[in-house]
């Protein structure tokens, strides 16, 4: 049933800290955050599946730190096990990708042409998502 898709968290992060939005490999707080979010994703999947009924088969979005593309690709983000669906991938990876940043988020509105460099950045990002998740049977939702 695709009428309802659960998302347990939206942009979970270390609010107010230096690496609130950016992942720094090896940074103690970043690594602790990733481990905590991995645990929370497991708890969310378990809680939803244990309610029974259609929730045993519904799609669930799981996310990395800050729902960040960078964190999700480069950290120790893990997709939790889904024992209710061992032969079907019912967990979807959720990432927010504000890229190319200069084109989509920069306050200078004069940057309004989609350049080959911007295209290449998106291509590389999509390629990384493909190699890490889609190639392994997981779907990705980009917000």
Question: Where would I find each of the regions flagged by the language model?
Answer:
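Active-site region of glycoside hydrolase catalytic domains
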Residues: 2-109, 125-143
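Mobile cap/lid helix-loop segments that gate and shape the active-site cleft of serine hydrolases
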Residues: 111-123
């Amino acid at each position: 049933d695709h009428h309802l898709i659960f998302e347990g968290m939206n942009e979970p992060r270390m609010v107010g800290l230096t690496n609130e939005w950016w992942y720094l490999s090896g940074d103690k707080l970043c690594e602790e955050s990733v481990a905590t979010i991995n645990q929370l994703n497991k708890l969310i999947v378990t809680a939803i599946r244990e309610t029974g009924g259609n929730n045993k088969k519904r799609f669930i979005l799981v996310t990395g730190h800050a729902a960040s593309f960078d964190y999700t690709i480069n950290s120790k983000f893990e997709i939790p096990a889904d024992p209710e669906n061992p032969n079907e991938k019912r967990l979807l990876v959720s990432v927010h990708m504000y890229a190319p940043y200069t084109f989509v988020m920069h306050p200078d509105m004069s940057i309004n042409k989609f350049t080959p460099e911007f295209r290449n950045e998106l291509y590389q990002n999509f390629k990384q998502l493909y190699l890490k998740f889609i190639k392994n049977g997981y779907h990705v939702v980009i917000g």
